[in-house]
Swiss-Prot record:
One BP term from GO: translation
Organism: Nostoc sp. (strain PCC 7120 / SAG 25.82 / UTEX 2576)
GO molecular function: rRNA binding; structural constituent of ribosome; tRNA binding
Assembly and interaction partners: Part of the 50S ribosomal subunit.
A cellular component annotation (GO) from this entry: cytosolic large ribosomal subunit
Pfam short name (any one): Ribosomal_L16
The UniProt record lists the keyword rRNA-binding: yes
PROSITE patterns named in the record: RIBOSOMAL_L16_1, RIBOSOMAL_L16_2
The keyword Ribosomal protein appears for this protein: yes
NCBIfam families noted in UniProt: rplP_bact
Gene name for this UniProt entry: rplP
Protein name: Large ribosomal subunit protein uL16
Key words of the record: Ribonucleoprotein, Ribosomal protein, RNA-binding, rRNA-binding, tRNA-binding
UniProt lineage: Bacteria, Bacillati, Cyanobacteriota, Cyanophyceae, Nostocales
Function: Binds 23S rRNA and is also seen to make contacts with the A and possibly P site tRNAs.
Length: 142
């Protein structure tokens, strides 16, 4: 599972998820992509489950790029702990995803295979997603 090797601070504030993704919202590497339509925290476990689902489906052919990285620690208190006595310990890592963000990209496979692989990956994620094709993106920009 993905997590940072080291961070400057162990704990982070939760923050807000307003607005759209401007960075990471264009197809850069592959021919097909999965784009987020809702804001959410996506855990490293969900990213790994999606990656496994895609790699199992496309087998040897093709290449997959993961365009998000879980760099935010989420802390939790132990069960049945009284209020106070500080912030809990980091339990897992999440990637902050805003609408428009490209989550995964695939190249080297047909559109049907890519579409099905992305569908399997999308099942593992807690958000609505959209399948994007490079040729359609180029046509819209012209």
């Amino acid at each position: 599972m993905l997590s940072p090797r080291r961070t400057k601070f162990r704990k982070q504030q939760r923050g807000r998820m307003g607005g759209l993704a401007h960075r990471g919202s264009t197809l850069n590497f592959g021919d097909f992509a999965l784009q987020a339509q809702e804001p959410a925290w996506i855990t490293s476990r969900q990213i790994e489950a999606s990656r496994r689902a895609m790699t199992r489906y496309i087998r040897r052919g093709g290449k997959i790029w993961i365009r998000i990285f879980p760099d935010k620690p989420v802390t939790m208190r132990p069960a049945e702990t009284r209020m106070g006595s500080g912030k809990g310990n980091p339990e897992f890592w999440v990637a902050v995803v805003k609408p428009g963000r490209i989550l995964f990209e695939i190249a080297g496979v047909t559109e049907e295979i890519a579409r099905e692989a992305m569908r399997l990956a999308a099942y593992k994620l807690p958000i609505k997603t959209k399948f994007i094709v490079r040729s359609q993106v180029v046509e819209e920009q012209e």
